[in-house]
């Protein structure tokens, strides 16, 4: 249904935090690992761009839990992904849980997860080279403009940097052909 609505972007942010059922249960998340996988597959099959936010180092996260998370990210190939390391908050149940993950282990897991996503994001962005998209012009930086399409959320995702032979009005939409890709940003030319 969403795909057919012209005023709805083909972009979903599903902040799932983890995929291990053990960790989801310990987090008091009501969703199941199986349901999360099903939802992600369904939206990817429909051509939706998916973003998520994941956490590493929640108390009790084992090497197996983390590897399950890595495998899930590798198979799902999120278009956009953020991650953070668990940080205990005074007075919360999680801060008092046993099996706190050491900081150096959290950092190593975070680095591995973000390295994996960097490669996925670069491949996803390279696949957009040669395509044309509608871009909201947000600002001018030097001789180039900066904007985003329906697939880049403000403040969390990368930007599209593009040149134009004609001045572009900030706040307007222009068509841009994507000519280059980095892991998180795209380059292009107005057409």
PLM segments and residue spans:
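Conserved non-cysteine loop/helix-boundary elements of the Radical SAM core domain that shape
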Residues: 1-80, 88-105
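Terminal RNA-binding accessory module
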Residues: 85, 96-191
